[in-house]
Amino acid sequence: MKLIALILGLIIERAATHLLHLRELRWFDAYFDYGEAQARKFPAGFGLIGSLVVLFLPVLPVVVISVAFRDVLWDLPYLLFAVIVLLFSLGPRDLGEEVDEFRRASTTGDDATVQRVGKVLMETDGDDEPVPRAIGEAIFVQANNRIFGVVFWFVAFGPLGAWLFRVSDLYRRRSAFESSRSGNENNHVELIHGVLSFIPARLAALGYAVGGSFDDAFDAWREYRRDDDEPFPKTTDRISAAVGCGAMEVGGNVPATNEAAAGGAMRLVTRALFFWITVLALMTLFGWAV
């Protein structure tokens, strides 16, 4: 059932991407801002509990509906609900469409669009011009936040898992934006998202190795583990970025232009996704997954 819902969700998401702008869910920003203000009132040492409460409240309706739809009409209502939740969990924007827009702008010399889309992909407010390796790394990080994390938790816990990961990413993005504006940092949100991203990021990295240059990918993985001195939440993003760039290296180098780097990274993301869907299909065929 999950495999059917996953395949349907991915197909519809790709085909109807122009109709799914509601997935940006801007109306959650006010909720997160209010929740952050309340969480800061918790006694010292209990801020993590406050952040968890803010995270789990929007997930409760999905839990209730999932339980209510189980074993009703051969699970057809549950299947429909799972596809809808998955559609709203993938994103907020279609990564392939954004990469295509970035590549077109790079090819035609549209610097304004390159700068705008580059900022979105790299989640930065800086004015620095995107460079090929940074763009490649950003696409691999975004793939984990927008696709692989959602897919992993959907397979693990159905609509509940997908929506939980989606809300954690929305919360992380809003918290980072408010932190850059006000200076009030909430490390608990980044920690929670890092925990949820830990396994998907490594599975995605393995998919990149299978779909690209296997030896270069594992060399990059070993090199990163040897040189890593970053705190835990940041390692999740860095390992998928490092292995992804290693997997798409040509002659030991990442493609030299933004257009080539973005295209190579997105093709690798697509191959890794197909690889894991194939693995899931085989597991389902042999009765090892549902």
How should these model regions be labeled?
Residues 1-290:
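Hydrophobic N-terminal alpha-helices or hydrophobic patches in metabolic proteins across all domains
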